[in-house]
Curated annotation (Swiss-Prot):
Enzyme class, broadest EC rank: oxidoreductase
Catalytic activity, as annotated: N(6)-[(R)-lipoyl]-L-lysyl-[protein] + 2-oxoglutarate + H(+) = N(6)-[(R)-S(8)-succinyldihydrolipoyl]-L-lysyl-[protein] + CO2
One Gene Ontology biological process: tricarboxylic acid cycle
Name listed for the protein in its UniProt record: 2-oxoglutarate dehydrogenase E1 component
EC number(s) given by UniProt: 1.2.4.2
Cofactor(s) listed in the protein's UniProt record: thiamine diphosphate
Main function: E1 component of the 2-oxoglutarate dehydrogenase (OGDH) complex which catalyzes the decarboxylation of 2-oxoglutarate, the first step in the conversion of 2-oxoglutarate to succinyl-CoA and CO(2).
Primary gene name: odhA
HAMAP family to which the protein is assigned, alphabetical: SucA_OdhA
CC per GO annotation: cytosol; oxoglutarate dehydrogenase complex
This protein's UniProt keywords: Glycolysis, Oxidoreductase, Thiamine pyrophosphate
Pfam families attached to this UniProt entry: E1_dh, OxoGdeHyase_C, Transket_pyr
Organism of this sequence: Staphylococcus epidermidis (strain ATCC 35984 / DSM 28319 / BCRC 17069 / CCUG 31568 / BM 3577 / RP62A)
Length: 934
């Protein structure tokens, strides 16, 4: 027991049953004060100096204190409550504050304390940051209450990391020195006047036009401007912003500096591009079908925020929150250096993401949880996203009590161990401080921060909507509530910083500025593009890469992939499998299987200077234990990545096992590729069946982004697909959905049957990247075919040639009466059946590329068959699924009533496949035999 027991116990602080523990902690404190929590450091310091001589007041009232509790303990409980629950009483609601029920006790009286008692206690007991500022605990607690119950409410006590909690406590409780001088306040008012004036002008001159006004959370714009300035102070030159439609036009105009003339032109349906700045600083793209104005993004290169920065606002569909992982991926791409050997290096200070959410959608859309889960993962971290919830406390017509089960819309973020700052959107200077705290935290800890910007919505969901139909009571108060422009202007008038005339002059000047811009536009200059033709670069299918390789070149690569460090111990069982990859180069009849073909393709692509990033669940090994891109030492668990050691490598290879998420990971990879168009981004599904968890990414980004926004992507999808008796959830990648989305040469969809064709396909896709011809590639990748000898090919098929849209057999054309078209595993099943049961009247064709459909190639084959009678399409999917409904119009045109056209496959089904493996075999056999014999 401590030698200082007498000194300790004589201090009249009653620890009751915890005395023994406290004595031990006091011993630790005397040896090293930093070894105990800061609250105890303060307490122990008062004991040591005799400041703790306060008589305990036994009580059983108010604060729930038990008889014998000390005054100090009650003070500390009050302080803890203020820190933990002060946000519930904070002044964060500009209008219509909610009624809180059962709020924890937060007042001095609740703990049987009073001013007289507290004035006898050192302020250090309240916070170590107050010791030299306030004379006593009472003054310090008053300060604490103002801080924790003021216009910024803090939630950080849920964070597990003590270092982060201590940092936040110090930052919050250290008296804040206002960062804004009088001139800066004037500028801030002018910015608000432009934000508000922009909305007022549009509201007056384009009555009922949808713009999804920012009014009610107007301070978002100066918050973004200040964030970008602070980022510039850190040397961050790339800012990636994602947001939905509310306030988007204002952000485009006042953050990305899109000219008023361009924005007004869009409302007038005239050509806005006539007003695009000639200096090239503003990049705005649009596709041939385009999109509504409040979905469009842009990129601005500007010096307006202190240094030259590239500010990007991501294009966005109406699907709320779905852009979040896209922005994260774009940011990571900007941070990664892929022009080096091995894996990429990541610099979090090169770029940062700002993701703007809605209060109804943030807790409502699961994509947010998936995206935040990426935040600290090696393959996905961006060094911290700044999340701003534009909280207008309503979702269309739905109020919070119907929209979420939590106190705040931000509560879902607590599970990710990040700080949350709620701030009153009408307190302009508080919003600026919130941004400063958030940016300092991100810089210190490289973690996400959430700011809940609490405001209101001035009008309905859109400007044609009448909110009083469903929300009459809130809107009675909102209509009477002054805008933040007026509130802040009056505040500056009261402070003597500006006069009332100056305030009104600034407000009026914005309307004049917009009127001047409006007058420059010729209302008769209407846009007229009824044909909406796709660009010339998309007129042709993906072109084959015809580069030849010598046998020795590929052998050198293969040998390097099997050359491990001397002290690295590959699992013996695995090593035997990998050593077989030498056989194609050393043994007659040796074949290159699917995984080896992929590795050789990747290596040659890296030699060409194209970086590769492959992610997905279990992708390092491969779901079917085929890839083994990352090897693990069986003795110590160390890893080795052979593709980091390719001879003459010119770019990085990056591979990561993804979290168990589809939507966010696909969105991340899409964003990465949009930002770094020269990078070969690949997402691999664990099973293709699970890819539909990302359907909105396929629908709204991958397939349509170029047509809508002019946004090019070359993202590649590997989707394991084949009917192998594993049931309806492990058979189908829903090929039919990708074919339904295919149009205007917007993608390439393949179902391959040859390892060499896979090799050439990957090289063709890599060669197209960062060109106008680039487009997504969707691969129905194999499962059992990964090790199939019919799929494996000799090395001479890799040294030359190119990708083949169809594969035919050598056959006597005079004997052929039937052509069977099939793809993927169905083709292999038929090929192996015919190998055992030869039939020279049948020509089997592998349709490797389903989209764009190889009409001309098939047509040429059919023309060469003088006695052809029947063309059959064979698939293993049900008739209402797979490729049949897509290929039918093409085949109907090809046969042109000259031949019979028949379908062989499963009948129409609600579920893709049979659940019983034996029944599957019977059905599969029936399809094969029927297609051959009928």
């Amino acid at each position: 027991m401590t030698k200082n027991k007498k000194e300790f116990t004589e201090a009249p602080v009653n620890f009751g049953a915890n005395l023994g523990l406290m004595l031990d902690l006091y011993d630790d404190y005397l040896q090293d004060p930093s070894s105990v929590p800061e609250d105890l450091q303060v307490l122990f310091s008062t004991i040591k100096t005799g400041e703790a001589h306060i008589e305990a007041k036994p009580t059983t009232d108010g604060g729930g204190s038990q008889a014998g509790d000390s005054t100090i303990k009650r003070v500390m409980r009050l302080i803890d409550n203020i820190r933990q629950y002060g946000h519930l009483k904070a002044d964060i609601y500009p209008v219509n504050p909610p009624e809180r029920q059962n709020v924890p006790k937060l007042e001095i009286e609740d703990f049987d304390l009073d001013k007289e008692t507290l004035e006898k206690i050192s302020s250090g007991i309240v916070s170590e940051h107050f010791k030299d500022i306030y004379d006593n605990a009472y003054d310090a607690i008053v300060r604490m209450e103002r801080r924790y119950k003021g216009p910024i409410a803090f939630e950080y006590t849920h964070i597990n990391n003590n270092k982060e909690r201590v940092w936040l406590k110090r930052r919050i409780e250290t008296p804040y020195k206002a960062s804004l001088n009088d001139n800066q306040k004037k500028e801030l008012f002018k910015k608000l006047a432009h934000v508000e004036g922009f909305e007022k002008y549009l509201h007056k001159n384009f009555v009922g036009a949808k713009r999804f006004s920012i009014e009610g959370v107007d301070t978002l714009v100066p918050m973004l401007q200040h964030t970008i300035t602070l980022a510039g102070n850190e040397g961050i030159k790339n800012i990636q912003i994602g947001m939905a439609h509310r306030g988007r036009l204002n952000v485009l105009t006042h953050v990305l500096e899109k000219p008023y003339e361009m924005m007004i032109s869009e409302f007038m349906h005239t050509d806005p591009m006539k007003f695009l700045p000639e200096d090239g600083s503003l990049e705005l793209t649009s596709g041939w079908t385009s999109d509504v104005k409040y979905h469009l993004g842009g990129v601005k290169t500007t010096n307006s925020y202190g240094i030259e920065q590239r500010i990007s606002l991501a294009n966005n569909p109406s699907h709320l929150e779905i852009v979040a992982p896209v922005v994260a991926g774009k940011t990571r791409a900007a941070q990664d250096n892929t022009h080096q050997v091995g894996g990429p290096s990541t610099d979090f200070h090169k770029a940062m993401p700002i993701i703007i959410h809605g209060d109804a959608a943030y807790p409502g859309q699961g994509i947010n949880f998936e995206t935040m889960n990426l935040g600290s993962l090696k393959g996905y971290s961006t060094g911290g996203s700044l999340h701003i919830i534009t909280n207008n406390r309503i979702g269309f017509t739905t109020e919070p009590f119907d929209g979420r089960s939590t106190t705040y819309s931000s509560d879902v973020a607590k599970g990710y161990d990040v700080p949350i700052l709620h701030v009153n959107a009408d307190d302009v200077e508080a919003t600026i401080e919130a941004i400063e705290i958030a940016m300092e935290f991100r810089k210190e800890f490289h973690k996400d921060v959430v700011i809940d910007l609490v405001g209101y919505r001035r009008y309905g969901h859109n400007e044609m909507d009448e909110p009083s139909i469903t929300n009459p009571v809130p809107y009675q108060n909102i209509r009477k509530h002054d805008s933040v422009e007026i509130l802040y202007g009056k505040k500056l008038v009261d402070e003597g910083i500006i006069s009332e005339d100056e305030m009104n002059e600034v407000i009026d000047s914005v309307q004049k500025e917009m009127r001047t811009a409006h007058d420059k536009i010729d209302k008769n200059d209407k846009m007229n593009n009824p044909d909406m033709e796709k660009p010339e670069s998309l007129q042709l299918p993906l072109q084959s890469d015809t580069k030849d390789f010598s046998f020795d070149h590929l052998k050198e690569i293969n040998d390097a992939m099997l050359d491990y460090p001397k002290d690295f111990h590959v699992l013996k069982k695995l090593n035997k499998v990998l050593e077989k990859r030498r056989e194609p180069f050393e043994k007659e009849g040796g074949l290159v299987d699917w995984a080896q073909a992929e590795q050789l393709a990747f290596a040659t692509i890296l030699q060409d200077g194209t970086s590769i990033r492959l992610t997905g669940q279990d992708s390092e090994r491969g779901t079917f234990s085929h890839r083994h891109a990352v090897l693990h030492d069986e003795e110590n668990g160390n890893t080795f990545t052979p593709l980091h050691h390719v001879p003459q490598q010119q770019a990085t290879f990056d591979i990561h096992n993804s979290p168990l998420s589809e939507a966010a990971v696909v969105g991340f990879e899409y964003g990465y590729n949009v930002e770094n168009k020269g990078n070969f981004n690949i997402w691999e599904a664990q099973y293709g069946d699970f890819s539909n968890m990302s359907q909105m990414m396929f629908d709204n980004f991958l397939s349509s982004s170029r047509a809508k926004w002019g946004e090019r992507s070359g993202l590649t999808l590997f989707l394991p697909h084949a009917f192998e008796g594993q049931g309806p959830e492990h058979s189908s990648a829903r090929l039919e959905r990708f074919l339904q989305l295919a149009a205007e040469n917007n993608s390439t969809v393949v179902n391959l049957s040859s390892a060499s064709n896979y090799f050439h396909l990957l090289r063709a896709q890599a060669a197209s990247l960062d060109t106008l011809e680039m487009r997504p590639l969707i691969v129905m990748s194999p499962k059992s075919l990964l090790r199939n000898k019919t799929v494996a090919k000799p090395i001479d098929e890799f040294t030359s040639g190119g990708f083949k849209p169809i594969i035919t057999e050598d056959i006597d054309e005079q004997k052929v009466k039937k052509v069977i078209l099939a793809s993927g595993k169905m083709y292999i099943d038929l090929k192996e059946y015919l190998a055992k049961n030869p039939n020279d009247s049948i020509l089997l064709i592998a349709v490797e590329r389903l989209y764009p459909f190889p009409e001309e190639e098939i047509k040429e084959v059919l023309k060469s068959l003088p006695h052809l009678e029947n063309v059959s399409w064979v698939q293993e999917e049900p008739k209402n699924q797979g490729a049949w409904l897509f290929v039918y119009p093409y085949l109907k045109a090809l046969v042109a009533n000259k031949y019979d056209l028949t379908y062989h496959g499963r009948i129409q089904r609600a579920a893709p496949a049979e659940g019983d493996g034996e029944i599957h075999k019977l059905v599969q056999t029936k399809i094969i035999e029927s297609s051959i014999n009928n």
